[in-house]
UniProtKB/Swiss-Prot annotation:
Subunit structure: NDH-1 is composed of 14 different subunits. Subunits NuoA, H, J, K, L, M, N constitute the membrane sector of the complex.
PROSITE patterns noted in UniProt: COMPLEX1_ND1_1, COMPLEX1_ND1_2
Organism encoding this protein: Chlorobium phaeobacteroides (strain DSM 266 / SMG 266 / 2430)
Catalytic activity: a quinone + NADH + 5 H(+)(in) = a quinol + NAD(+) + 4 H(+)(out)
MF GO annotations: NADH dehydrogenase activity; oxidoreductase activity, acting on NAD(P)H, quinone or similar compound as acceptor; quinone binding
Compartments in which it is found: Cell inner membrane
TM region positions: 31-51, 106-126, 139-159, 178-198, 217-237, 269-289, 313-333, 352-372
Name of the molecule in the record: NADH-quinone oxidoreductase subunit H
Main enzyme class: translocase
InterPro entries xrefs: NADH_UbQ_OxRdtase_su1/FPO, NADH_UbQ_OxRdtase_su1_CS
EC number(s) reported in the record: 7.1.1.-
Annotated GO CC locations: plasma membrane
Keywords (A to Z) from UniProt: Cell inner membrane, Cell membrane, Membrane, NAD, Quinone, Translocase, Transmembrane, Transmembrane helix, Ubiquinone
Family according to the record: Belongs to the complex I subunit 1 family.
Length: 372
């Protein structure tokens, strides 16, 4: 009964379809006036919630890594080591913030900030439920694809500003990798947009709703959809520098890549940006191909499972669950697949993924035109 009551809540943290609509409805003013401050104030707790969740992504990775290696992982601080990450944050806050003497201090300082901002700006267009979205853009999918480019600037600033050859090598590798893999990733997402007929991420999600649950998801609407789905997942691993594409921070070659010289909270901010990007690409994959906030459970005869597990609160649960599932897969692959060489990385992008992405795009267009 309580679960059904929660699913009927229509006024969660945000009223309306976006923070903009919420602030305007609350005050009666235009978004260009006073409500803009309300939007910022409303976004602050969301950022802290995201930081809290991503912080425990580090704990999750350590536990998963330990499980893969038949270890226990963090166990000392708190029950099952659940407070270990908080202890690490306190430790990093007390660490000395070292800036190399020969570094470009401006670039060295702003690099992690640009990375962090670029990672979290994408959260603005992620529809967490029908009433929980920061900005409902009609080109939200393009925004999510393009915002990754900001991280390239931060990586270059961090690598060049460090005045360290290993940092610069790592930055150049990372930029080449991200820019290259944006092409197959973008084409794969356009296949999903073609199936929905819109670039609005909220509309893409709403078009995948229905009483049959997962059967309405884009991934199961066409046999061709599996191709762009797999291409985007592989390309997204490269975009966020996860194994087997973690060449920019290969420990045996580059120490720690473009953040070799960083310490203290700057080091922590770079890691938070990485985990933020991991969730972002996982959420985009879930929205475009797996229904986003929609429940995957179908109705079973007289039991309306889909209706019982739908609504704003359930929507947040479903999209976060789907996102964290793909984060788990990313962590799993880290201890399963060996690291690729640079030439293998580029070969996979330009001679395998990109041609297949174009093939998937053409086949999706043909399917949408000729198959009712």
């Amino acid at each position: 009964m309580s679960v059904m009551a929660l699913s009927q809540i229509r006024i969660p943290l945000l009223m309306g379809n976006s923070l903009n609509a919420w602030s305007e409805a609350l005050t009666g003013f235009s978004i260009w006036g006073f409500p803009l401050g309300l939007v910022i104030l409303a976004a602050i707790p969301l950022v802290f919630i995201a930081l809290y969740a991503l912080t425990y992504g580090v704990y999750g990775e350590r536990k998963i890594s330990a499980f893969m290696q038949d270890r226990l992982g963090p166990m000392e601080v708190g029950k099952w080591g659940i407070l270990q990450t908080l202890a690490d944050i306190l430790k990093l806050l007390q660490k000395e913030d070292i800036v190399p003497a020969a570094a470009d201090k401006f670039l060295f300082v702003v690099g992690p900030g640009i990375l962090f901002v670029g990672s979290f700006l994408a959260f603005a267009v992620l529809p967490f439920s029908s009433a929980f979205i920061g900005a409902n853009l009609n080109v939200g999918l393009f925004y999510a694809i393009g915002i990754v480019s900001i991280e390239v600037v931060g990586i270059l600033a961090a690598g060049w500003g460090s005045n360290n050859k290993w940092s610069l090598y790592g930055a150049v590798r990372s930029v080449a990798q991200i820019v290259s893999y944006e092409i197959p990733a973008g084409i794969a997402l356009l296949c999903g947009a073609m199936m929905a007929g819109t670039l609005d991420m909220q509309q893409i999600t709403m078009l995948q709703s229905g009483h049959l649950g997962f059967a309405h998801f884009n991934l199961f609407q066409s046999p061709i959809a599996w191709l762009p789905f797999l291409i985007y997942f592989i390309a997204s691993l490269a975009e966020v520098n996860r194994a087997p594409f973690d060449i920019p921070e290969a420990e045996s070659e580059l120490v720690a890549g473009y953040f070799t010289e960083y310490s203290g909270m700057k080091f922590a901010v770079i890691f938070l940006a990485e985990y933020g990007s991991m969730f972002m690409v996982s959420a985009v994959l879930s929205i475009v191909f797996l229904g986003g906030w929609n429940s995957p459970l179908p109705d079973l005869g007289p039991v309306s499972l889909n209706a019982m597990t739908s609504g704003p609160v359930w929507g947040v649960f479903w999209i976060i669950s789907k996102g964290f599932f793909f984060i788990f897969v990313q962590m799993w692959l880290r201890w399963t697949l060996p690291r690729l060489r640079v030439d293998q990385l580029m070969y996979l992008c330009w001679k395998v993924l990109t041609p297949f992405a174009f093939i998937g795009f053409v086949l999706t267009a043909i399917w949408e035109i000729y198959v009712p």
